[in-house]
Amino acid sequence: MVQLNQNFINTIAQELPAHLSMDDFIAACSRPLRRSIRVNTLKISSEDFKQLMLPKGWTFEPIPWCEDGFWISYDEEEQLGNALEHIQGLFYIQEASSMLPPTALFTPNADWQCVLDLASAPGSKTTQMAALMNNQGLLVANEYSASRVKVLHANVLRMGASHCALTHFDGRVFGEYLYESFDAVLIDAPCGGEGTVRKDADALKSWSLDEVLEISETQKALIESAFLALKPGGSLVYSTCTLNRHENQGVCEYLQQTYGDAVQFESLSQLFDGAEKATTPEGFLHVWPQIYDSEGFFVAKLTKTRSVPRLQPEPKLQKNFPFTEASAKQAKAIQAYFADDLGIKLPDDLIMVRDDEFWLFPHEFRDFIGKMRFQRIGVKLADHSKHGFKVRHEAIIALAGKALTAGAANGAKVVDVSDEQAKEYLMGRDIPLDTAGKAQGEVIVCYGGAPLGMAKHLGNKLKNSLPRDLVKDKVLLLPPQA
């Protein structure tokens, strides 16, 4: 049973718009959330995904504000996180409201080249933006919590987002170190979580106004840092999964009071059909849970109309960046390996070398070298030794993508497996082959047109090359429904 703190109810009663009912709000908070997912278009189109899942008993209701988002129904005993299609990265389990901020940031401009996600983990919005960018440009994804950085990296890897650079900093430093560096910034701020009560019945059990006010001070510092990191003419989206004015409108008003006409709020009333139901007088979206039968959420968008003074002197460039640009000979060798042995044409990005490692960075990353320490950049392509190149799992997941079928026609060594074989592979087991043949060496294991990873073809079996940390204890095969 949902427990709503009386102090919270009293506060919300003063803020709830006149056309909305408090009884409807409480009733909505007491209902379970509708299940929702976002199709990962880096790997599969929404239409192809629906055709894949409809025979398995899924039904799809479009989410109005996300072209690739759907409310779904299916056998609720199934643990979707274990589903083969989820492990493959074909979809992300994402609450519908949380799809709003990336949509707001990329509408109407979908051509941002340098984007910052200031508070990224676990990665739903990061990977949504990576798909909207179609793995072009540079997406810097920051997370302050060390344990959550690992989760973020795992999701970026699973979804095949190749143009991300991960950082692990307090978000308040970005205005100083990466001053006016980004075309667009998303800050989905840490918050009181009042909108999440439908999935966490105890979220508001110990709600207090003092804690709200304390959090709002952190949010003000974060939005100011994000604004300073934004280029003039760029767009910033600020969002929370909370409902009170202190953490929402109050934070946006603080920024405008601080920077005056450099802050221009953009109305979101036309973002999607029905957006006006949640639009505030300022043009923000204040999504109460009863409006769209979703989590509570807040989204604001602004344009930075002019440059503003930096608050700190420009930091010195950091030395000893461990990567160097590949020589023409090195670049040609790694390109030939991917093309000839794997049937994959490498994108026209920066090929970088560190010791015997070959990496692929976005071109846009050049401007960021030495300005900040990055946990992870781009994609590790391969290791090189006297025996030649050995491709890395993440490169196959990120770069093979939807091109595998075409790649096979171009000479790629691809082995298509059944669903049962795919399950065995993801659980770390070797796959016996029905007929023995000539050993083919390294091959790409593929299921349903999307890569699972690498294996060594020994003639009578596929020797599993899946990294040990990605081996699953359980893989769910969703059965066809009559």
From Swiss-Prot:
- Give GO terms: molecular function aspect only: RNA binding; rRNA (cytosine-C5-)-methyltransferase activity
- Locations listed in the record: Cytoplasm
Please name the catalytic residues of this protein.
Answer: 241 (nucleophile)
Residues binding S-adenosyl-L-methionine, per UniProt: 119-125, 143, 170, 188
Root EC class: transferase
Where is it chiefly localized? cytoplasm
Record field: transmembrane:
none
State the EC number(s). 2.1.1.178
Reaction(s) catalysed by this chain, per the record, are: cytidine(1407) in 16S rRNA + S-adenosyl-L-methionine = 5-methylcytidine(1407) in 16S rRNA + S-adenosyl-L-homocysteine + H(+)
Instruction: List the InterPro entries hit by this protein, alphabetically.
Output: Methyltr_RsmF_N, MeTrfase_RsmB-F_NOP2_cat, MeTrfase_RsmB-F_NOP2_dom, Nol1_Nop2_Fmu_2, Nop2p, RCMT, rRNA_ssu_MeTfrase_F, SAM-dependent_MTases_sf
Q: Which Pfam families match?
A: Methyltr_RsmB-F, Methyltr_RsmF_N, Methyltranf_PUA, YebU_pre-PUA_dom
Q: Name one GO biological process term.
A: rRNA base methylation
Source domain of life is Bacteria
Q: Which UniProt keywords apply?
A: Cytoplasm, Methyltransferase, RNA-binding, rRNA processing, S-adenosyl-L-methionine, Transferase
Q: Which NCBIfam families match?
A: nop2p, PRK11933.1
Described function: Specifically methylates the cytosine at position 1407 (m5C1407) of 16S rRNA.
Q: HAMAP family annotated for this entry?
A: 16SrRNA_methyltr_F
Q: Which family does it belong to?
A: Belongs to the class I-like SAM-binding methyltransferase superfamily. RsmB/NOP family.
State what protein this is by name: Ribosomal RNA small subunit methyltransferase F
